[in-house]
Amino acid sequence: MTPEMLKTVIQNNIKASLEITSPNPGLPVCFLQYTEQNFSRNFYHMEFAEYKTLLEQVSKALLEAGRQVCLVDFNPEQYKKWLKEKNLTDSQQTRSAFASGLGKGPEI
């Protein structure tokens, strides 16, 4: 992955998570936390190690900016069920909403 592509992924990840919590900045910004087994290289267009580093950097930056951060363990079966119940398709926005819902943030 090129540095420019990584920058775009970082920006999209932060943007999606912040859009969900922006109506209430007191809510934590939630991100999904994957294991190597349930991480999707095709979805994120990066390797698992890159994602872990990115997650650490983003979380640290948000904490330094005064935001709360929560990491939610990703459960693929639970996520698929949630998508079906909400009649949604897989996207960065829906993954962020799913993480926020599990992290007691707002749902879409």
Residue ranges and their predicted role:
Residues T2-Y44:
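Extended, charge-biased low-complexity segments
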Residues A49-P106:
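Amphipathic protein-protein interaction modules
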